[in-house]
Amino acid sequence: MAKLNYASNMSLDGWTEDSSGGFNWAPPDDDVFVSITELMGSAGTYLYGRRMYETLAVWETDASLANRSDLTANYARAWQAADKVVYSSTLAEPLTTKTRLERDFDVDTVRGLKATASGDLLVGGPNLAAQAFAAGLVDEVALFVWPIILGGRNPALPTDLQLDLELLHEHRFESGVVNL
């Protein structure tokens, strides 16, 4: 059975977005980027909400991103190689290949996907992840904690659940980012 993993960048105070909804508070860091690329490459299927999907679709729709460096080319290859399931009630059609749309996050369907997938699944985006956490579907969490206090919005982790977790890994990057 495949694992369903959740990965997210977050500020020290637990937010994924700044107060205006932006992500650019996490400046480029090559070592962190390599680690995230390896994590992305370890999954065969990504589960996204519409907003996260639209943010990341550029890794397939904008060839200039992949051409910037070997690091970005590797990330683009990993992203494009994976199947994507996008949960959206408003998106009319996929923006990328290897992508299917689902109107609702159905717990039984995701359980079935975990049971039949040949590779692990990676859920991206805190809102969709909160649904997976609430259903008891998340097997592992990978957080990249940036040394910044945002006072932002959109918490990286559900605020209405208590879960006992086991620390499997920790790594501190030279930039101060900590991967848990």
Give residue spans per PLM region.
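Enzymes that bind and transform nitrogen-containing heteroaromatic metabolites
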Residues: 1-180
